[in-house]
Amino acid sequence: FNEVIFVKDISMQELKNTATQMRMKVIDMIYKAQSGHPGGSLSAADFVTACYFKYMNLDPKNPRWEDRDRMVLSKGHVCPIQYACLATVGFFPESVLDTLRKEGSMLQGHPSMNRCPGIDISTGSLGQGLACAAGMALAGKLDHKDYKVFCVVGDGEAQEGEIWEAANTAHKYGLDNLIVFVDNNNLQLDGTCD
């Protein structure tokens, strides 16, 4: 791949343009797969893009680097936006995006840490990701590491008790290295999040 340079001083307009490019990649991937969850991927694009292109410390050549920042998609079904970002920053060739949800592909409908470089935790069951992220953040504190853990939670899954238990755990242990984004798109499987 091309050498990746992380532009930490990227402007807001450049981030917006990059998020638009990531959305276009998501639409293309899901269209080619004829399967997927476009809504949640598109609504999470701004903050996932900002994390990967401005805030996260990563090394695409060393995906398991011990001091890297971590990303947890608690709502794992929105992984197409994560895949688009990972490919663009150099974790794997962008041509792999065309294999989304294909048999044998490393890009499945939920992220798999055993298949895809750059995925820090396999997620799928809604409500569990924040607990995993809190555990990673606590491990970082106990190991005296400086990495941050970014977690994307859906507003629908925020109705799960495990989310609130994880939030209480984060507070109890002072996990200031845990950054949580709630994707408040007001949608869930069976309607709105009223």
Regions found by a protein language model. Give the residues of each.
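Flexible, compositionally biased loop and terminal segments
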Residues: 8-11, 17-20, 24, 44
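Alpha-helix capping and helix-loop boundary segments enriched in small/acidic/polar residues
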Residues: 13-17, 190-193
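N-terminal capping segment at the start of a domain
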Residues: 19-35, 183-184
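Cofactor-binding active-site loop characterized by glycine-rich and histidine/acidic residues
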Residues: 26-29, 41-172
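Short, Lys/Arg-enriched N-terminal segments with co-localized hydrophobic residues
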Residues: 1-7
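A short, conserved beta-to-alpha structural element at the edge of catalytic cores
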Residues: 172-194
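A short, structure-level motif marking secondary-structure boundaries and short turns
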Residues: 11-12, 32-33, 67-68, 151-152, ...
